C-alpha cells in the first residue's frame, strides 16, 4: 500500500501527487481529517484488535512495540501488525482546484515517477543491458496480502532473530508437541498434544511472528500458538495426561511412532461427498468410458488403491473442515467432477505445486485429469483449483510427514509410480479395449449374434438372438473359407436356411452376412467414425431449418454410415469382384443347382424372403420381417384367399419360369445382356444391358403370368403399388424411381393388357432405347456411388445397405417406425407380391448367390436396391407408387392388412404396376396434372445432363427399366435416410401428401394421373400444357426440394414439408393447377388414409414424398430428385469404394476430408445458387400459372422450362451432392 518509509499519515502542507480526472497532478494538502487504524496483537495473550492511532503510545510503524489502551483504560504491550490510513485529505492543485481524496488517491510527490532505486543512469539508452526494463520500479503487490510484505520486511529487519525463529520452527515442523496454555479463568495451566505444521497450510489463520501453526490431536483444529509455549513430546518427556487428554495423547504418541492418522483427523465422507464422489467417479467413468479417455485411467488408477483414495479424501475433507474452509460441494472443473485424488497425485508427481511454474504444465495436468480443454484458461483453472482445494493439504502433508500411511504412503510416495502405472494401465486398457473391440467384432463376424455396428447391434440383437443357432452353423462353416467362398456359402446357407426356416433362417443368414460385413465395417469404421463432423457435412440451405437440422443429424449419421459402408464396402466390392468372375463365368454347378433348389423352395419362401429383404431394405430387422412374414402370410390368407391362391399360382408359375431363367442366367451369366434376356424379372432390375425390346419381352413374359388374372392383379397391383410405393419411398433412390416407374409402367402396361402392353412397349422401346445408354452411365455412376454409399451385402446389398443405413439408421426409433409402417405396407403388398416376389426373389436370391455383389450392383444398382427387394419390382415400384398411393388410399381405408399382406412390391409389383400404369396413364390422359408429360416430352438425355434430368425422369423411368441399378446408392441413402428420418419427418408431410395423392387418386384419378404421368413417363403427353407447366413446377419444386443428391433425403423432406407448408398445392404446382377441390379431396382422403399412408410414408418416405409432391408433381420430382441423386455420383467428390479399399486409413481419411472440403466449397457456391433458384422457381411458377392456360398445347416449351427447372434442381442437388457442379453452372 505504501512504501516502507512513508509516514502512517500525511500532514498538512505536504506536497503530493493527487489524482485528478484520472491523472496524478501536483498538489498540496490543505486540510486533513486524520483517521489511522492500527491492528495490534497483545503480547500477553496473542489476541488481535484494531484500534485508532490515538489509543496508541509509541511509533506508528509496522512491527513496532507500542502500548495500547485497553477497553478498561489500561495500557498493555502490543505489536503493530498493520497500519491503515483512512484519513480524508483536501488538496489544492496548482490552478486552485480543491478536491477531497483518500490516501489511496495520493502519493508522495515524485515517488510514482522515480522509484528510489531508479536513476537516470539505468535508463535504457545509457544502460543497454537494462533495455526494455521499465524505468519505474515494479509495483508492489497490490493484492489483499500486500500488507504482509512490509510487515514481514519490517518485522524481519532484525533478520538474525527471525532466522533463528524460523530455523526453530522448521525444526519443529512435523513434530508432535505439547502446547501449554492458560485456561480462560487463568487459574490453571493446561496443555494439549498437537502436531506442528507449516503456516502455509492455512490462509485463514494468521500466524504471527514467533508463533507457529499446530494441529491439535484433541479436536483436530488448527491454531496459532506462541513458539515459546510449545515443547516437543517424546515418550519419555511427555507430561502425564489426564483422562480427558488420554485418548488424544495416545493418538499423538501413535502418530509419533508410526504416523498413524488419528480418527478425529478424518471424516466420514458425507453422502454428498463420498458417495457423490463415488457416483461422480462412476459418472466420470461413464463419460470417459464413452470416450475411453482418462476416466478409465482414473478408475484404473483408483481401483488398485481404493482405500488410499478413501483415506486421502477423508483426511482432506477433515483438514479443510478443521482449518475453516470445508468442502461443501463437490469440486468441479471444466464442467466435470474434479478428482482431487488424481489431481493431488499428478501435481505430486511433478514435484508439488511450488515446482510447477509453467502454465503449459498445468494445462497438461488438466488434460491428464481427463477433462476436455475448453479454453485457454484450462491451465490457470486447474492451478486455482489445486490451490483452493489441495495446496494447503499438500503443505500440511509435507510438513507433517504424512504419507497417508493407511494406504496412501504408497500413494504419496509412489504417486508418480502410481501415475505411471495408471497411465500404463490406461494405455493398456485403451489398447486392450480396442483389441477387445476388434475381437468382439471378429467374434461378431464369427457369431452373428453380436451385431458389429453399434447401431446395428441394438437392432440386430433382436434378430440375432433367435437366429443364433443357424447363424452359428453358418459362421462355423464360414471362417475357414475365403471371402468369396464365404459369401457364396453364406448365400447358399441363407438360401438353404430360408428354405428350411423360411421365416427366421433367412434373416439369420442375412444377419450373419451383415454381421460379418458389419464387423468389418465396424473395424473399418473404428478408424473413421468420428472424423466426419456435422459441420463438415455440407447441406443446402433450407427454409425448413428445424427439419434441416434434423436431417443434418440424420445425414451426419448417414454420412458416417456411408463412410463406414464405404470402408467396409471395399470389402464388399472385393467380394463382389472375387465372386464376379465366378458369377460372370458360369456359376459352379453346385451354385446353379443350389440356386435352382433355392428358387424352387424360395417360391414358397420367396414372399418371406422378399418380405425379409424388403423389411431389411425398409429398415425392418430380419427377425421382425420373418415374424411379419408369417403374420403377413396368415393375413394374406385370411384377407385374400382367392387372390392369394391366384397369386400363389402366379408365383409358382413365375417361380418356375424364374428358376428356369435363373438356371439359364447362370449358364449365360458370362454376359449381362444374356442374363437380362434370360431373366426378365432380373432384366428389369438389370435393365442396364437390356434393350427396350428385351425388356419388353421380359416384361411381357412376366406379365403373361399375370395376364390371366389381370383384374385381380390390378387390384393386387394397386395393393402392390401401395407396397411398392412404400418400398420405393424406402428406396428413395431417385433415379430408380423414375426408371423404375418407367419400367413398372411399361411392365404394368404390358401385363395389364396385351394391347396396352404393346402400346406401352412401343412407347417404351424408344424411351428405353434412348435411356438405356443413360441408364448404363447412370448405373455406372450409381454403381460407384453404391459402392461408395452402400455396402452391398448378400442380397443385392439391399439388405445390408438398408441395414447399414438402418444401422446408420439415424435412429433405431426411425427404423422402428419405418419398420412398423413397412410391415403394414409389406404385409398388404406381400400378399399379392409374395408370389411374384417369391419367384423373383427366388431367382433373385439364386442370382445373388451366384453373382458377385458388385456385378449384381452393376446390373441391379437401381434394381439392386429395389431389385434387392425384388429385381423386377424396383421398376414397378415407381408406377406402383402412385397407384399404390391410390390403392393405398383405397386399400388402406379398406384393409391395412392387405397392405401388410403385400410383401414386396418386388417382381410381383412390377407386373401389377405395369397394368396399373396403363390405368394410370389412361387417367393421366384425363389429367394434365403431372409435369411428367413435359418431362416425357423432353428428349431423353443422359440423366446427368440437366435436360436429362427432365428426361432423366423419362430416362429414369426408362432406364429404371434399363438401369434401375444406378439409383440404389443414393436411393438407398435417401431411402434409409428418408425411410427412417423421413419416415418420421416426412411421414407427417408425406402422409399428408400421399394421402392427398391417394385422396386424389380416390376422389379423382387426377392425382394419380399426375403421378402416373410422371411415373409413366413413357407416355409423352404434350396434351396437357398444365402438365408441362406442372412438370416445370415440379422440376422447380424438385429443385427446391430435391436440390441435393446427398440431401435428397433432405430435399424430399423439404418437398414434403414444402408441400405441407404450401398446402400441397404450392409445391405440387400440379396440385395447384388441378384445383383447390382436389386439394380438399386430398385432404379428406388424407384424413381417411392417414394411417395407411403413414405406414407407406414411413416405409417409403422419399417415394411418398414424391407422390405427395409428386403425386401430382411429386412423381416427377422424385424422378428428378432421383436423377439428381444419380448425378452426384459422377462428381469430383464421388469415388469408388474399390479405390478406398486400396488406401491406408490415413489416406482414406485425407481423401474423404478433401472430398468434404470440395463439397463444402461447392456447397457455399450452391448456397447462393439456391437463393437465386428459389427466386427463379417463384418466377417460373408465376409464369407457369399464367401460361398454364395458354401453353396447354405446347409441351415442348414446358419441357424446356422443365429442363431448366431440372437444371436448377440439379444445381440445387449439386448443393447437396455438390456433384452437380456442371449442373449448377448450367443453372446459373
UniProtKB/Swiss-Prot annotation:
GO terms for biological process: chromatin organization; establishment of Sertoli cell barrier; genomic imprinting; positive regulation of transcription by RNA polymerase II; regulation of transcription by RNA polymerase II; spermatogenesis; transcription by RNA polymerase II. Residues 437-464, 483-511, 556-569, 596-606, 635-667, 691-700, 721-730, 755-765, 825-843, 911-926, 972-981, 1112-1124 have a biased composition (Basic and acidic residues). Residues 944-965, 1003-1017, 1188-1204 have a biased composition (Low complexity). It is found in: Nucleus. Residues 277-305, 701-713 have a biased composition (Acidic residues). SMART domains: ARID, BRIGHT, TUDOR. Residues 123-167, 266-307, 437-466, 479-525, 539-606, 620-802, 825-1129, 1168-1204 are annotated as: Disordered. Signal peptide: none annotated. Residues 306-398 form the ARID domain. Pfam families: ARID (PF01388), RBB1NT (PF08169). Gene3D superfamilies: 2.30.30.140, ARID DNA-binding domain. Keywords: Chromatin regulator, Coiled coil, DNA-binding, Isopeptide bond, Nucleus, Phosphoprotein, Transcription, Transcription regulation, Ubl conjugation. The modification Phosphoserine is found at residues 276, 295-296, 482, 579, 581, 588, 630, 691, 703, 930, 945, 1068-1069, 1071, 1075. One of its GO terms (cellular component) is nucleus. CDD domains: ARID_ARID4B, Tudor_ARID4B_rpt1, Tudor_ARID4B_rpt2. InterPro entries: ARID/SWI1_ChromRemod (IPR051232), ARID4A/B_PWWP (IPR012603), ARID4B_ARID/BRIGHT (IPR028853), ARID_dom (IPR001606), ARID_dom_sf (IPR036431), Tudor (IPR002999), Tudor_ARID4B_rpt1 (IPR047476), Tudor_ARID4B_rpt2 (IPR047474). PROSITE patterns: ARID (PS51011). GO terms for molecular function: DNA binding; transcription cis-regulatory region binding. Component of a Sin3A corepressor complex consisting of SIN3A, SAP130, SUDS3/SAP45, SAP180, HDAC1 and HDAC2. Interacts with ARID4A. Interacts with AR. PANTHER family: AT-RICH INTERACTIVE DOMAIN-CONTAINING PROTEIN 4B, RBP-RELATED. This is AT-rich interactive domain-containing protein 4B. It comes from Rattus norvegicus (Rat).
Amino acid at each position: 500500500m505504501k512504501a516502507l518509509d512513508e509516514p502512517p499519515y500525511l500532514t498538512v502542507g505536504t506536497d503530493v501527487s493527487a489524482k485528478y480526472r484520472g491523472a496524478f497532478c501536483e498538489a498540496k494538502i490543505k486540510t486533513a481529517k486524520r483517521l489511522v487504524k492500527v491492528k495490534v496483537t497483545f503480547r500477553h495473550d496473542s489476541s488481535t484488535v484494531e484500534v485508532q492511532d490515538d489509543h496508541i503510545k509509541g511509533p506508528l510503524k509496522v512491527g513496532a512495540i507500542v502500548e495500547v489502551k485497553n477497553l478498561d483504560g489500561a495500557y498493555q504491550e502490543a505489536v503493530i501488525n498493520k497500519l491503515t490510513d483512512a484519513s480524508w485529505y483536501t488538496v489544492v492543485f496548482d490552478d486552485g482546484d480543491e478536491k477531497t481524496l483518500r490516501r489511496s488517491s495520493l502519493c508522495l510527490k515524485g515517488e510514482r515517477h522515480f522509484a528510489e532505486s531508479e536513476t537516470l543512469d539505468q535508463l535504457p539508452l545509457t544502460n543497454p543491458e537494462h533495455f526494455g526494463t521499465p524505468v519505474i520500479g515494479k509495483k508492489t503487490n497490490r493484492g489483499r496480502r500486500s500488507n504482509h510484505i512490509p510487515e514481514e520486511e519490517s518485522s524481519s529487519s532484525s533478520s538474525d532473530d527471525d532466522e533463528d525463529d524460523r530455523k526453530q520452527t522448521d525444526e519443529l515442523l512435523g513434530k508432535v508437541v505439547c502446547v501449554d496454555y492458560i485456561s480462560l479463568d487463568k487459574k490453571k495451566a493446561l496443555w494439549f498434544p498437537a502436531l506442528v505444521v507449516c503456516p502455509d497450510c492455512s490462509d485463514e489463520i494468521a500466524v504471527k511472528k514467533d508463533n507457529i501453526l499446530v494441529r491439535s490431536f484433541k479436536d483436530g483444529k488448527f491454531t496459532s500458538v506462541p513458539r515459546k509455549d510449545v515443547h516437543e513430546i517424546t515418550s519419555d518427556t511427555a507430561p502425564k495426561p489426564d483422562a480427558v487428554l488420554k485418548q488424544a495423547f495416545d493418538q499423538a504418541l501413535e502418530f509419533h511412532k508410526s504416523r498413524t492418522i488419528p480418527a478425529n483427523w478424518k471424516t466420514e465422507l458425507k453422502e454428498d461427498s463420498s458417495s457423490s464422489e463415488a457416483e461422480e467417479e462412476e459418472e466420470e467413468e461413464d463419460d470417459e468410458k464413452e470416450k475411453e479417455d482418462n476416466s478409465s485411467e482414473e478408475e484404473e488408477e483408483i481401483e488398485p488403491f481404493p482405500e488410499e483414495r478413501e483415506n486421502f479424501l477423508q483426511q482432506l475433507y477433515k483438514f479443510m473442515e478443521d482449518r475453516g474452509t470445508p468442502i461443501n460441494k463437490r469440486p468441479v472443473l471444466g464442467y466435470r467432477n474434479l478428482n482431487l485424488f488424481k489431481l493431488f497425485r499428478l501435481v505430486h508427481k511433478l514435484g508439488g505445486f511450488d515446482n510447477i511454474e509453467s502454465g503449459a504444465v498445468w494445462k497438461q495436468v488438466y488434460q491428464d485429469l481427463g477433462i476436455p480443454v475448453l479454453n485457454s484458461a484450462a491451465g490457470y483453472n486447474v492451478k486455482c483449483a489445486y490451490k483452493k482445494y489441495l495446496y494447503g493439504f499438500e503443505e500440511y502433508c509435507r510438513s507433517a510427514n504424512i504419507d497417508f500411511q493407511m494406504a496412501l504412503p504408497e500413494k504419496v510416495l509412489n504417486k508418480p509410480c502410481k501415475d505411471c502405472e495408471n497411465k500404463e494401465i490406461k494405455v493398456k486398457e485403451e489398447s486392450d479395449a480396442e483389441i477387445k473391440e476388434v475381437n468382439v467384432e471378429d467374434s461378431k463376424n464369427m457369431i452373428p449374434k453380436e451385431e458389429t455396428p453399434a447401431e446395428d447391434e441394438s437392432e440386430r440383437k433382436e434378430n440375432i438372438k433367435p437366429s443364433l443357432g443357424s447363424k452359428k452353423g453358418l459362421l462355423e462353416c464360414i471362417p475357414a473359407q475365403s471371402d468369396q467362398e464365404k459369401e457364396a456359402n453364406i448365400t447358399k446357407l441363407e438360401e438353404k436356411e430360408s428354405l428350411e426356416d423360411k421365416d427366421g433362417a433367412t434373416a439369420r443368414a442375412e444377419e450373419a452376412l451383415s454381421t460379418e460385413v458389419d464387423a468389418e465395417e465396424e473395424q473399418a469404421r473404428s478408424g473413421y467414425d468420428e472424423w466426419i463432423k456435422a459441420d463438415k457435412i455440407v447441406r443446402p440451405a433450407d427454409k425448413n431449418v428445424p427439419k434441416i437440422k434434423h436431417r443434418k443429424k440424420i445425414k451426419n449419421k448417414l454420412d458416417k454410415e456411408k463412410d463406414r459402408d464405404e470402408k467396409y464396402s471395399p470389402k464388399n466390392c472385393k467380394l463382389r469382384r472375387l465372386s464376379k468372375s465366378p458369377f460372370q463365368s458360369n456359376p459352379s454347378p453346385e451354385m446353379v443347382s443350389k440356386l435352382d433348389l433355392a428358387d424352387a423352395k424360395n417360391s414358397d419362401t420367396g414372399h418371406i424372403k422378399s418380405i425379409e429383404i424388403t423389411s431389411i431394405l425398409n429398415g425392418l430387422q430380419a427377425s421382425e420381417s420373418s415374424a411379419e412374414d408369417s403374420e403377413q402370410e396368415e393375413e394374406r390368407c385370411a384377407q385374400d384367399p382367392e387372390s392369394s391362391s391366384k397369386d400363389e399360382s402366379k408365383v409358382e408359375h413365375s417361380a418356375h419360369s424364374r428358376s428356369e431363367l435363373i438356371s439359364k442366367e447362370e449358364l449365360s451369366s458370362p454376359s449381362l445382356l444374356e442374363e437380362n434376356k434370360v431373366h426378365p424379372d432380373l432384366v428389369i432390375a438389370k435393365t442396364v444391358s437390356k434393350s427396350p425390346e428385351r425388356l419388353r419381352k421380359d416384361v411381357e413374359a412376366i406379365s403373361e403370368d399375370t395376364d390371366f388374372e389381370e383384374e385381380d392383379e390390378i387390384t393386387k397391383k394397386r395393393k402392390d403399388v401401395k407396397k411398392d410405393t412404400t418400398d420405393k419411398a424406402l428406396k428413395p433412390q431417385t433415379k430408380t424411381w423414375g426408371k423404375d416407374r418407367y419400367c413398372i409402367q411399361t411392365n404394368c402396361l404390358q401385363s395389364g393388357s396385351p394391347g396396352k402392353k404393346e402400346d406401352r412397349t412401343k412407347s417404351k422401346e424408344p424411351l428405353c432405347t434412348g435411356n438405356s445408354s443413360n441408364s448404363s452411365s447412370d448405373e455406372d455412376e450409381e454403381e460407384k456411388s453404391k459402392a461408395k454409399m452402400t455396402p452391398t451385402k448378400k442380397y443385392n446389398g439391399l439388405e445390408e445397405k438398408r441395414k447399414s443405413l438402418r444401422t446408420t439408421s439415424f435412429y433405431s426409433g426411425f427404423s422402428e417406425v419405418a419398420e412398423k409402417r413397412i410391415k403394414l405396407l409389406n404385409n398388404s403388398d406381400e400378399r399379392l407380391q409374395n408370389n411374384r416376389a417369391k419367384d423373383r426373389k427366388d431367382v433373385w436370391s439364386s442370382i445373388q448367390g451366384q453373382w458377385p455383389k458388385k456385378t449384381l450392383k452393376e446390373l441391379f444398382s437401381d434394381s439392386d436396391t429395389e431389385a434387392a427387394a425384388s429385381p423386377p419390382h424396383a421398376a414397378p415400384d415407381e408406377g406402383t407408387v402412385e397407384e399404390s398411393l391410390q390403392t393405398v388410399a383405397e386399400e388402406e381405408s379398406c384393409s391395412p392388412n392387405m397392405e401388410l399382406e403385400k410383401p414386396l412390391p418386388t417382381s410381383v409389383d412390377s407386373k401389377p404396376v405395369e397394368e396399373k400404369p396403363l390405368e394410370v396413364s389412361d387417367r393421366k390422359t384425363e389429367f394434365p396434372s403431372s409435369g411428367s408429360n413435359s418431362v416425357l416430352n423432353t428428349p431423353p438425355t443422359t440423366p446427368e445432363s440437366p435436360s436429362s434430368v427432365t428426361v432423366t425422369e423419362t430416362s429414369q423411368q426408362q432406364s429404371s427399366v434399363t438401369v434401375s441399378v444406378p439409383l440404389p446408392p443414393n436411393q438407398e441413402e435417401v431411402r434409409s435416410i428418408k425411410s427412417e428420418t423421413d419416415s418420421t419427418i416426412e411421414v407427417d408431410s408425406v402422409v399428408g401428401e400421399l394421402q392427398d395423392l391417394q385422396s386424389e387418386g380416390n376422389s379423382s384419378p387426377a392425382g394419380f394421373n399426375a403421378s402416373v404421368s410422371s411415373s409413366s413417363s413413357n407416355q409423352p403427353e404434350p396434351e396437357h400444357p398444365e402438365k408441362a407447366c406442372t412438370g416445370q413446377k415440379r422440376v422447380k419444386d424438385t429443385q427446391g426440394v430435391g436440390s441435393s443428391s446427398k440431401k435428397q433425403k433432405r430435399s424430399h423432406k423439404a418437398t414434403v414439408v414444402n408441400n405441407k407448408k404450401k398446402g400441397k398445392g404450392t409445391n405440387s404446382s400440379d396440385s395447384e393447377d388441378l384445383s383447390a377441390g382436389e386439394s380438399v379431396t386430398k385432404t379428406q382422403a388424407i384424413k381417411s388414409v392417414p394411417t395407411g399412408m403413414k405406414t407407406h410414408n414411413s416405409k417409403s418416405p422419399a417415394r411418398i414424398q414424391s407422390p405427395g409432391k409428386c403425386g401430382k408433381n411429386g412423381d416427377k420430382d422424385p424422378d428428378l430428385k432421383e436423377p439428381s441423386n444419380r448425378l452426384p455420383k459422377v462428381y469430383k467428390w464421388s469415388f469408388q469404394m474399390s479405390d478406398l479399399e486400396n488406401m491406408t486409413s490415413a489416406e482414406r481419411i485425407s481423401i474423404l476430408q478433401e472430398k468434404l472440403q470440395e463439397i463444402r466449397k461447392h456447397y457455399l457456391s450452391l448456397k447462393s445458387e439456391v437463393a437465386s433458384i428459389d427466386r427463379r422457381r417463384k418466377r417460373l411458377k408465376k409464369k407457369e400459372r399464367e401460361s398454364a392456360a395458354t401453353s396447354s398445347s405446347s409441351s415442348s416449351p414446358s419441357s424446356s422450362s422443365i429442363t431448366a427447372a431440372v437444371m436448377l434442381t440439379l444445381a440445387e442437388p449439386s448443393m447437396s451432392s455438390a456433384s452437380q457442379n456442371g449442373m449448377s453452372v448450367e443453372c446459373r
